[in-house]
Protein backbone atom coordinates (compact mmCIF):
# COMPACT_ATOMS: atom_id res chain seq x y z
CA UNK A 1 0.00 0.00 0.00
CA UNK A 2 2.79 2.41 0.89
CA UNK A 3 4.04 2.45 -2.72
CA UNK A 4 0.57 3.35 -4.01
CA UNK A 5 -0.35 5.99 -1.46
CA UNK A 6 1.63 8.92 -2.97
CA UNK A 7 -0.24 8.73 -6.30
CA UNK A 8 -3.77 8.08 -5.04
CA UNK A 9 -4.69 11.77 -5.03
CA UNK A 10 -3.62 12.11 -8.67
CA UNK A 11 -5.51 8.97 -9.66
CA UNK A 12 -8.61 10.30 -7.95
CA UNK A 13 -8.57 13.47 -10.09
CA UNK A 14 -8.35 11.71 -13.48
CA UNK A 15 -12.05 10.94 -13.72
CA UNK A 16 -12.02 7.17 -14.10
CA UNK A 17 -15.37 5.43 -14.28
CA UNK A 18 -13.95 3.04 -11.69
CA UNK A 19 -10.57 1.89 -10.44
CA UNK A 20 -10.13 -1.88 -10.17
CA UNK A 21 -7.93 -2.22 -7.13
CA UNK A 22 -9.03 -5.27 -5.19
CA UNK A 23 -10.07 -8.88 -5.52
CA UNK A 24 -8.66 -11.54 -7.77
CA UNK A 25 -5.02 -12.16 -6.95
CA UNK A 26 -4.52 -8.86 -5.07
CA UNK A 27 -6.26 -10.29 -2.01
CA UNK A 28 -4.09 -13.41 -2.08
CA UNK A 29 -0.92 -11.36 -2.68
CA UNK A 30 -1.61 -9.18 0.36
CA UNK A 31 -1.80 -12.23 2.58
CA UNK A 32 0.94 -14.39 1.07
CA UNK A 33 3.60 -11.96 -0.04
CA UNK A 34 3.07 -8.50 1.45
CA UNK A 35 2.08 -9.25 5.03
CA UNK A 36 -0.87 -6.86 4.60
CA UNK A 37 -4.46 -7.12 5.70
CA UNK A 38 -6.40 -6.89 2.39
CA UNK A 39 -9.43 -5.42 4.17
CA UNK A 40 -7.33 -2.68 5.76
CA UNK A 41 -5.77 -1.96 2.36
CA UNK A 42 -9.25 -1.57 0.87
CA UNK A 43 -10.33 0.83 3.61
CA UNK A 44 -7.17 2.92 3.12
CA UNK A 45 -7.73 3.05 -0.64
CA UNK A 46 -11.34 4.14 -0.13
CA UNK A 47 -10.33 6.89 2.30
CA UNK A 48 -7.89 8.30 -0.28
CA UNK A 49 -10.08 7.90 -3.37
CA UNK A 50 -13.13 10.03 -2.59
CA UNK A 51 -14.23 10.73 -6.19
CA UNK A 52 -13.51 7.42 -7.91
CA UNK A 53 -15.66 4.31 -7.46
CA UNK A 54 -13.62 1.28 -6.43
CA UNK A 55 -14.02 -1.93 -8.38
CA UNK A 56 -13.06 -5.48 -7.54
CA UNK A 57 -12.78 -8.74 -9.45
CA UNK A 58 -14.78 -11.66 -8.03
CA UNK A 59 -14.58 -15.27 -9.18
CA UNK A 60 -18.30 -15.94 -8.81
CA UNK A 61 -19.07 -18.76 -6.39
CA UNK A 62 -15.31 -19.12 -5.77
CA UNK A 63 -15.14 -15.54 -4.41
CA UNK A 64 -11.38 -14.89 -4.17
CA UNK A 65 -10.42 -18.50 -3.61
CA UNK A 66 -9.99 -21.62 -5.64
CA UNK A 67 -13.03 -23.65 -4.62
CA UNK A 68 -16.77 -23.09 -4.39
CA UNK A 69 -18.19 -21.51 -1.24
CA UNK A 70 -21.72 -21.79 0.11
CA UNK A 71 -24.29 -19.12 -0.68
CA UNK A 72 -24.28 -17.76 2.89
CA UNK A 73 -20.51 -17.22 2.66
CA UNK A 74 -20.95 -15.51 -0.72
CA UNK A 75 -23.59 -13.21 0.78
CA UNK A 76 -21.45 -12.34 3.81
CA UNK A 77 -18.42 -11.66 1.63
CA UNK A 78 -20.31 -9.39 -0.80
CA UNK A 79 -21.77 -7.44 2.13
CA UNK A 80 -18.33 -7.04 3.70
CA UNK A 81 -16.73 -5.94 0.42
CA UNK A 82 -19.31 -3.18 -0.09
CA UNK A 83 -19.21 -2.14 3.58
CA UNK A 84 -15.42 -1.77 3.39
CA UNK A 85 -15.42 0.38 0.25
CA UNK A 86 -16.16 -1.55 -2.94
CA UNK A 87 -18.64 0.17 -5.27
CA UNK A 88 -18.50 -2.07 -8.36
CA UNK A 89 -18.06 -5.82 -8.50
CA UNK A 90 -16.89 -7.44 -11.75
CA UNK A 91 -18.04 -11.05 -11.49
CA UNK A 92 -16.87 -13.87 -13.73
CA UNK A 93 -16.72 -17.64 -13.88
CA UNK A 94 -13.79 -19.31 -15.62
CA UNK A 95 -16.23 -21.70 -17.35
CA UNK A 96 -18.66 -18.94 -18.39
CA UNK A 97 -21.37 -20.77 -16.45
CA UNK A 98 -23.90 -18.21 -15.20
CA UNK A 99 -25.02 -20.65 -12.50
CA UNK A 100 -21.64 -20.13 -10.84
CA UNK A 101 -22.23 -16.35 -10.90
CA UNK A 102 -25.87 -16.19 -9.86
CA UNK A 103 -25.44 -15.98 -6.08
CA UNK A 104 -22.64 -13.42 -6.36
CA UNK A 105 -24.76 -11.26 -8.69
CA UNK A 106 -27.77 -11.47 -6.39
CA UNK A 107 -25.89 -10.68 -3.18
CA UNK A 108 -23.68 -7.98 -4.71
CA UNK A 109 -26.77 -6.15 -5.94
CA UNK A 110 -28.48 -6.65 -2.58
CA UNK A 111 -25.44 -5.09 -0.88
CA UNK A 112 -25.74 -2.04 -3.15
CA UNK A 113 -22.89 -2.62 -5.59
CA UNK A 114 -22.94 -2.00 -9.32
CA UNK A 115 -22.64 -5.50 -10.79
CA UNK A 116 -20.63 -6.02 -13.94
CA UNK A 117 -20.87 -9.56 -15.29
CA UNK A 118 -17.84 -10.65 -17.29
CA UNK A 119 -17.60 -13.34 -19.92
CA UNK A 120 -14.21 -14.97 -20.31
CA UNK A 121 -13.08 -14.78 -23.93
CA UNK A 122 -11.29 -17.65 -25.58
CA UNK A 123 -11.06 -19.24 -29.01
CA UNK A 124 -12.53 -22.67 -29.74
CA UNK A 125 -15.18 -24.20 -32.00
CA UNK A 126 -17.81 -23.71 -29.27
CA UNK A 127 -16.85 -20.14 -28.32
CA UNK A 128 -18.73 -18.16 -30.95
CA UNK A 129 -20.43 -14.78 -30.99
CA UNK A 130 -23.72 -16.63 -30.59
CA UNK A 131 -22.50 -18.62 -27.56
CA UNK A 132 -21.23 -15.46 -25.85
CA UNK A 133 -24.54 -13.75 -26.61
CA UNK A 134 -26.44 -16.62 -25.00
CA UNK A 135 -24.37 -16.29 -21.82
CA UNK A 136 -24.83 -12.50 -21.85
CA UNK A 137 -28.60 -12.85 -22.20
CA UNK A 138 -28.70 -15.07 -19.11
CA UNK A 139 -26.57 -12.59 -17.15
CA UNK A 140 -28.84 -9.70 -18.15
CA UNK A 141 -31.85 -11.75 -17.02
CA UNK A 142 -30.09 -12.18 -13.66
CA UNK A 143 -30.00 -8.39 -13.30
CA UNK A 144 -26.45 -7.38 -14.17
CA UNK A 145 -25.87 -3.62 -14.45
CA UNK A 146 -23.23 -3.90 -17.18
CA UNK A 147 -21.36 -6.51 -19.19
CA UNK A 148 -17.67 -7.08 -19.77
CA UNK A 149 -15.84 -9.12 -22.39
CA UNK A 150 -12.84 -10.31 -20.37
CA UNK A 151 -9.94 -11.18 -22.67
CA UNK A 152 -7.37 -12.06 -20.04
CA UNK A 153 -5.22 -14.01 -22.50
CA UNK A 154 -5.02 -11.27 -25.11
CA UNK A 155 -6.47 -13.54 -27.82
CA UNK A 156 -9.32 -11.31 -28.96
CA UNK A 157 -8.61 -9.92 -32.41
CA UNK A 158 -9.99 -6.67 -33.83
CA UNK A 159 -12.59 -8.22 -36.16
CA UNK A 160 -13.98 -10.51 -33.46
CA UNK A 161 -14.08 -7.63 -30.97
CA UNK A 162 -16.07 -5.56 -33.45
CA UNK A 163 -18.51 -8.45 -34.00
CA UNK A 164 -18.97 -9.14 -30.29
CA UNK A 165 -19.42 -5.53 -29.21
CA UNK A 166 -21.73 -4.74 -32.14
CA UNK A 167 -23.85 -7.80 -31.41
CA UNK A 168 -24.10 -6.92 -27.73
CA UNK A 169 -24.95 -3.27 -28.45
CA UNK A 170 -27.65 -4.30 -30.94
CA UNK A 171 -29.14 -6.78 -28.49
CA UNK A 172 -28.87 -4.85 -25.22
CA UNK A 173 -29.20 -1.23 -26.31
CA UNK A 174 -27.93 1.18 -23.68
CA UNK A 175 -26.55 -1.45 -21.29
CA UNK A 176 -22.87 -0.56 -20.77
CA UNK A 177 -20.40 -2.96 -22.41
CA UNK A 178 -16.76 -2.98 -21.27
CA UNK A 179 -13.83 -4.69 -22.92
CA UNK A 180 -10.91 -5.87 -20.81
CA UNK A 181 -7.92 -7.13 -22.77
CA UNK A 182 -4.28 -7.94 -22.17
CA UNK A 183 -1.47 -7.22 -24.62
CA UNK A 184 -0.12 -10.79 -24.51
CA UNK A 185 -0.34 -11.33 -28.28
CA UNK A 186 0.14 -7.68 -29.26
CA UNK A 187 -3.48 -7.24 -30.37
CA UNK A 188 -5.03 -5.19 -27.58
CA UNK A 189 -4.51 -1.68 -28.99
CA UNK A 190 -6.08 -2.50 -32.35
CA UNK A 191 -8.74 -4.61 -30.68
CA UNK A 192 -9.79 -1.68 -28.49
CA UNK A 193 -9.85 0.59 -31.54
CA UNK A 194 -12.18 -1.70 -33.46
CA UNK A 195 -14.39 -2.41 -30.47
CA UNK A 196 -14.95 1.30 -29.85
PLM region spans:
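Glycine-rich phosphate-binding active-site loops on the catalytic face of alpha/beta enzymes
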Residues: 91, 151, 196
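Catalytic cores of alpha/beta
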Residues: 130-135, 139, 185-196
Amino acid sequence: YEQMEPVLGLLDEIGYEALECWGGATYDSCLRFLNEDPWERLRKLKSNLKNTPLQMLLRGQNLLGYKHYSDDVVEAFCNAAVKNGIDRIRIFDALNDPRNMEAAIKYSKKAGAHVQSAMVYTISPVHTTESFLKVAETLVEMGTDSLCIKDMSGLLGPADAYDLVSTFKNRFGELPIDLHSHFTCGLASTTYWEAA
